[in-house]
A protein has these predicted regions:
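Conserved ABC transporter NBD signature motif
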Residues: 61-70
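The feature captures the beta-strand-to-loop junction immediately N-terminal to the Walker
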Residues: 38-40
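Short coil-to-helix segment of the ABC ATPase nucleotide-binding domain corresponding to the Q-loop/switch region
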Residues: 96-103
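Conserved ABC ATPase signature
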Residues: 137-141, 145
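ABC ATPase NBD coupling module
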Residues: 70-84
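Helix-to-loop junction immediately C-terminal to a conserved catalytic motif
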Residues: 53
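Conserved ABC ATPase "signature" region
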Residues: 114-132
Length: 227
């Protein structure tokens, strides 16, 4: 999976004038790689993530998934089949159990109920969630467990692209480390394209490619050195 941004800009109406949140960004993201994006509040990070998720369309330029521009795609299908977003607040359905939350994208695709449940349970186990927790509601789980359920849902969906918005923001150091290691595994072993927006330098440093948003522009790329 290749995601190409071609002179992408996004503007919106401010109180007194139009505001440019993303300014003429050109970049190519590849599968098998973990990227981090840092930047100050208001630098355009979250807007860029929304553009990549198909939640917004560029005001100028285009974003293409394997050469197919998003403006010509069914963006609901894009989010259902290609892109998963992991949020800082987990974004789990409060009245669904852990396994039901993981099953949700599979049920949207009308996959066989028993097969969907089996896959959901396998992905929860892959994330270190004990079987006795599969039927717990989100408010019965710790923050780290809820984030692992959210990642299990992205895994079960089979998404090629994982967008993570401050995925460790509410977690302690131990859970943060586990989440980062999981994202690395998704990129390196399962060949997903993983893009992480973070304010944590340690999380950013764990990425293969480190990027920075400043005044709507994507800058300061650093490639990790091979050991």
């Amino acid at each position: 999976m290749t995601i190409e941004l071609r002179d992408v800009s996004y503007t919106y109406a401010g109180k007194y004038q139009r505001v440019t949140a993303v300014d003429t960004v050109s970049y190519t993201f590849q599968s098998g790689t973990m990227y981090s994006i840092m930047g100050a509040s208001g630098s355009g990070k979250s807007t860029l993530l929304s553009l990549l998720a198909g939640l917004k369309l560029p005001t100028e330029g285009e974003i293409a998934f394997d050469e197919q521009p998003t403006r010509f795609m069914d963006r609901s299908a894009l989010r259902r089949d290609t892109v998963s977003v992991i949020y800082q607040d987990f974004n789990l359905f409060p009245l669904l159990t852990a396994e039901e939350n993981v099953c949700y994208p599979l049920r949207l695709r009308k996959e066989d109920k028993d097969q969907a449940l089996a896959l959901a349970r396998q992905r929860l186990a892959d994330m270190g969630i004990r079987e006795s927790y599969f039927r717990k509601l989100p408010n019965q789980l710790s923050g780290g467990e809820q984030q692992r359920v959210a990642i299990a849902r992205a895994l079960a969906a089979g998404s090629y692209v994982i967008l993570a918005d401050e995925p460790t923001g509410n977690l302690d150091s131990g859970n943060s480390r586990m989440i980062v290691e999981t994202l690395q595994r998704l990129a390196h072993q399962e060949k997903r394209c993983v893009i992480v927006v973070t304010h944590d330098p340690a999380v950013a440093a764990a990425a293969d490619v480190q990027l920075r948003m400043q005044d709507g522009r994507l800058t300061q790329e650093e490639q990790q050195e091979e050991a």
